[in-house]
A protein has these predicted regions:
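Conserved beta-strand scaffold positions in the cores of enzyme catalytic domains, especially
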Residues: 28, 71, 132-134
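Short, flexible helix/strand-to-coil boundary loops that buttress conserved ligand/catalytic motifs
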Residues: 21, 65, 161
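Conserved core of the sugar-phosphate nucleotidyltransferase
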Residues: 108-176
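Short alpha-helical oligomerization interface
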Residues: 22-27
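Conserved N-terminal catalytic core of the sugar/cofactor nucleotidyltransferase
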Residues: 1-5, 16, 30, 34-118, ...
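Short N-terminal binding/cap micro-motifs at the start of the first secondary-structure element
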Residues: 14-18, 143
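Histidine-centered beta-alpha loop that forms part of the nucleotide-sugar donor binding/catalytic region
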Residues: 11, 55, 103, 137-138
Length: 176
């Protein structure tokens, strides 16, 4: 595999898509006959180690995926940054790239993930290492319920603000 680690954020309840009512973690929602998380781990099978950050109803994810992956627990859902921090023990003695993705993104492919990794490697080759390479999209419809990418005047990444927390100005941003 590729000398790289991947963190899959899969602790969420999925309130907006009704998973919580079903008693299922968001990443275990069925898409085309399989849980979303299954597609994500399959597409990331090229990496050295996959760490899943689990929380709500975590046993369902453990039971489905088994012990071929590493697990970190996010007891309280305190946001994306906190979820990544919950996996930090797996990087204590690691100095390589870490790909962070979401357990509810079943349509991202190996090809896309490898392009992100290549962009990071290219930045190193140019002697200008990127602290972060981010995959985002610009949506035509800003009314969709996604976190918005906030950038500064130089277009550098600042933060992601989840849709329910966005002010009116942030809701106009089309980059998610």
């Amino acid at each position: 595999g590729c000398f790289m680690k991947a963190v899959i954020l899969a602790a969420g309840k999925g309130r907006r898509i009704g998973s919580e009512k079903e008693g299922t973690p968001k990443a275990m929602r069925i898409v085309n006959g399989r849980p979303m998380i299954e597609y994500v781990v399959k597409e990331l099978s090229f990496v050295e180690e996959i760490i899943l950050v689990v929380g709500y109803k975590k046993e369902q994810i453990y039971e489905h995926l088994g012990d071929k992956y590493s697990y970190a627990v996010q007891e309280e859902q305190l946001g994306t940054g906190h979820a990544v921090k919950c996996a930090s023990e797996f990087f204590a003695d690691y100095d390589g790239p870490v790909l962070i993705t979401f357990g509810d993104m079943p349509l991202l492919t190996t090809k896309t993930y490898k392009k992100v990794f290549k962009a990071y490697n290219d930045s190193i080759k140019k002697n200008n290492p990127a602290a972060c390479v981010m995959l985002s999209v610009n949506l035509k419809d800003e009314s969709l319920p996604y976190g918005r990418v906030i950038r500064d005047r130089k277009r550098s990444f600042v933060e992601i603000v989840e849709e329910p927390d966005c002010n009116e100005e942030q809701k106009k941003i089309k980059e998610v």
